[in-house]
């Protein structure tokens, strides 16, 4: 986070990115979106305080069935993230590979949004495909369910209206070296 901050990066939400793509909304000079999948409690205990030190916010994609289970955030923690300026998105009901469940995709996509909005009382505007896996039905159901965008995984840093329902992200884990992370960044000092 210190590196991103020192290089002038500013966090934005998926919603702002969509407005910039579709309506020409203004975004900072070096925008970055920091996303976290699944809803691990470490997002609340570790990522939130560190990111707040640098004035950063993130987008967390919640698996509805994981809320409050084991090492996942509970309702209050997720709502605190939202109150701190974080965007909350859906990561499905049960984190299953969607294309391998053709009869369940719509429920995984649509019900997760409706249940999250009802349970958390926060808007759910974007979706993250579990494992980055999708097919033409997944895209159709995400649009039908009322999401404004969806994210997956990939190497392309240029986002456009052509891929609004499969915006690309880089996967960064505890094993990602600083050198590898820097290679993901489009703007360097």
In which residue ranges do the predicted regions lie?
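C-terminal active-site subregion of NodB/CE4 polysaccharide deacetylases
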Residues: 1-35, 40-44, 95, 99-189
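Short, well-structured secondary-structure segments
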Residues: 10-15, 33, 52, 56-68, ...
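Acidic (Asp/Glu)-rich catalytic clusters
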Residues: 48-56, 73-90, 143, 161
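Acidic/histidine-rich helix-loop elements
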Residues: 64-66, 71-72, 100-102
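Charged helix-capping and loop-helix junction motifs
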Residues: 71-78, 105-109
């Amino acid at each position: 986070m210190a590196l991103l901050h020192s290089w002038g990066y500013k966090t934005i939400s998926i919603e702002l990115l969509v407005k910039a793509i579709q309506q020409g909304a203004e975004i900072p000079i070096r925008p970055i979106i920091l996303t976290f999948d699944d809803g691990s409690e470490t997002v609340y205990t570790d990522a939130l305080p560190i990111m707040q030190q640098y004035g950063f916010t993130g987008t967390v994609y919640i698996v509805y069935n994981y809320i409050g289970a084991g090492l996942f955030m509970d309702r209050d923690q997720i709502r605190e993230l939202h109150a701190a300026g974080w965007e909350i998105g859906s990561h499905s009901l049960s984190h299953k590979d969607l294309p391998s469940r053709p009869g369940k995709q719509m429920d995984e996509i649509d019900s997760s949004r409706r249940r999250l909005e009802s349970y958390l009382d926060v808007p759910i505007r974007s979706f993250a495909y579990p494992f980055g896996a999708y097919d033409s039905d997944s895209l159709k159901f995400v649009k039908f369910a009322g999401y404004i965008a969806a994210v997956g995984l990939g190497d392309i840093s240029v986002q456009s209206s052509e891929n609004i329902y499969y915006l690309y992200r880089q996967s960064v884990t505890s094993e990602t070296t600083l050198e590898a992370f820097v290679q993901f960044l489009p703007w360097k000092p």
